[in-house]
C-alpha cells in the first residue's frame, strides 16, 4: 500500500518526536509513503510570522527529505478534472478553485490506483459541507478511495519511537 500524505501541519512536532520524522524519511525511501509535488510545495514554502521558513518547511527543504518523500509521478489532468468537477464543484469559479487548492491533485494520484494507494489526512469527514468547502475524506468517498488519518497510518504501519530496533 502506498500512503499519500496531505500537507497539513498537524503532525508531531519535529523537535519533540524526531523519530517520527526519521521514520517518514525511511518509509519514503522504501516507497511506502509519498507526498505529491503539488502538495509538497504547500508546506515546503511556508513562512512563520517573521517571514522565515518555519520548522516544517526547513525540514521539507532538506535534500534527503525531498528525495525520500516527493512523489515523482505526473498528475493526470483528466483525473484532476474528474475529482474537481465530480467531487467538489461542477462549474467552479476562480474563488472556489482557490479554496479547493491542491487537494484534487492529491486525490487524483490515489484514484489512479485505488487498490494500492490511500490518502492520509488530518481532515475529518464533514458530509454537510458542500462545493469548495468539502473535506478530503468526503471527496474520497465519492470515488471509493480509501482515506485514513495519520493515527490509522501509524497503527497500520506499526510505527513506534524505537522503530530502528526492528530493522
What residue spans do the PLM features occupy?
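Acidic, PIN/NYN-like endoribonuclease modules and their adjacent C-terminal/linker elements
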Residues: 116, 125-167
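Active-site-proximal, substrate-binding regions of enzyme catalytic domains
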Residues: 2-117, 125-126
Amino acid at each position: 500500500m502506498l500512503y499519500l500524505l496531505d500537507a497539513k501541519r498537524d503532525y508531531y512536532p519535529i523537535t519533540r518526536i524526531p523519530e517520527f520524522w526519521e521514520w517518514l524519511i525511511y518509509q519514503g525511501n522504501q516507497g511506502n509513503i509519498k507526498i505529491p509535488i503539488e502538495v509538497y510545495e504547500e508546506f515546503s514554502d511556508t513562512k512563520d510570522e517573521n517571514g522565515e521558513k518555519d520548522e516544517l518547511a526547513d525540514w521539507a527543504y532538506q535534500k534527503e527529505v525531498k528525495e525520500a518523500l516527493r512523489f515523482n509521478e505526473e498528475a493526470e489532468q483528466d483525473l484532476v478534472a474528474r475529482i474537481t468537477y465530480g467531487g467538489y464543484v461542477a462549474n467552479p469559479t476562480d474563488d472556489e478553485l482557490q479554496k479547493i487548492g491542491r487537494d484534487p491533485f492529491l486525490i487524483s494520484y490515489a484514484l489512479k490506483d485505488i487498490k494500492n494507494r490511500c490518502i492520509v489526512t488530518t481532515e475529518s469527514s464533514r458530509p454537510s459541507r458542500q462545493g469548495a468547502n468539502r473535506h478530503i475524506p468526503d471527496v474520497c468517498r465519492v470515488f471509493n478511495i480509501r482515506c485514513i488519518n495519520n493515527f490509522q497510518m501509524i497503527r497500520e504501519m506499526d510505527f513506534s519511537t524505537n522503530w530502528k530496533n526492528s530493522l
